[in-house]
């Protein structure tokens, strides 16, 4: 059992990926932080995919957090995470369809719990 706390370094502000996410990661890629991620909003898809690839090349576990409330939006987020090669899909409201998609595509799924509203999201 891991007795050391872990954290996820999220390159976000107010539920949006910061525009300088790649530069921030480049300055910190050699740290011992294992888990890195950002939101589905804020960067063009190609930049997201490239940044996740860089993170994985550095041996990091990758997380895409999606702020979505309908099953269709949540599924689009899961598809984006899979297309980016992410390890984890964070956020969304639980959906059996999203859960099945994540299992079929090797994504670990960690949806929001409780009542979630707005953006930035309020739990």
Can you say where each PLM-predicted feature lies in the sequence?
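Conserved N-terminal beta1-alpha1 strand-loop-helix module at the mouth
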Residues: 1-62, 71, 80-84
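Conserved anion-binding
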Residues: 59, 67, 71-123
